[in-house]
Amino acid sequence: MEQLKRKIREHGSVLSEQVLKVDAFLNHQVDPQLMRQIGQEFARRFRDQEIDKVITLETSGIAPALMTALELDVPLVFARKHRSLTLTDDLLTARVYSFTKQVESTVAISASHLAAGERILIVDDFLANGQAALGLAAIVRQAGARLVGIGIVIEKSFQPGRRALEEQGYRVESLARIASLAGSQVSFVE
């Protein structure tokens, strides 16, 4: 997706050979026009899958996932990383390791929000090692629902996430695939 690549080049910041900072438009300050385009593109790529719901992880996945759900005219459900007073009984949970934050947490979705047989699309901001998507996939399985695809805004293709997901048989669609962050330069998979 050329608009996204342009935004990454112009407003992204390479912090190391492993970390790309995109808080100017994706995961702190959000560019609503870009999110609309991202939602439209994911909807175009997955429209044939007859999706019932979009799921993501709080917080950074919410903006692109919401716009995708809006375009597909389906509900969005986001997994919570922290329990609240209202998130109590009948939880579907998975352990997820965050590459960026270097912490493991338990994420949860209320069982009442995912039903057996529903067709689910995961949308997330980044793909590195694939742990977030694998955790969400485990929650989908617990619900007896069917994961029909995974939409990733930015994939770090030099990390093993895509391979881990594809080995499980999941369809992965990434809007920007980064080949390298070496030398503080972003290079894309062409």
Swiss-Prot record:
Its EC number is 2.4.2.22. One of its GO terms (cellular component) is cytoplasm. Xanthine binds at residues 20, 27, 156. Keywords: Cytoplasm, Glycosyltransferase, Purine salvage, Transferase. SUPFAM superfamilies: PRTase-like. Pathway: Purine metabolism; XMP biosynthesis via salvage pathway; XMP from xanthine: step 1/1. It catalyses: XMP + diphosphate = xanthine + 5-phospho-alpha-D-ribose 1-diphosphate. GO terms for biological process: purine ribonucleoside salvage; xanthine metabolic process; XMP salvage. 5-phospho-alpha-D-ribose 1-diphosphate binds at residues 128-132. InterPro entries: PRibTrfase_dom (IPR000836), PRTase-like (IPR029057), Pur/Pyrimidine_PRTase (IPR050118), Xanthine_PRibTrfase (IPR010079). It is found in: Cytoplasm. It comes from the Bacteria. The keyword Glycosyltransferase applies. GO terms for molecular function: xanthine phosphoribosyltransferase activity. The keyword Nucleotide-binding does not apply. It is an enzyme of class 2 (transferase). It holds the Pfam family Pribosyltran. PANTHER family: HYPOXANTHINE/GUANINE PHOSPHORIBOSYLTRANSFERASE, XANTHINE PHOSPHORIBOSYLTRANSFERASE. Belongs to the purine/pyrimidine phosphoribosyltransferase family. Xpt subfamily. Converts the preformed base xanthine, a product of nucleic acid breakdown, to xanthosine 5'-monophosphate (XMP), so it can be reused for RNA or DNA synthesis. Homodimer. This is Xanthine phosphoribosyltransferase. The gene is xpt.
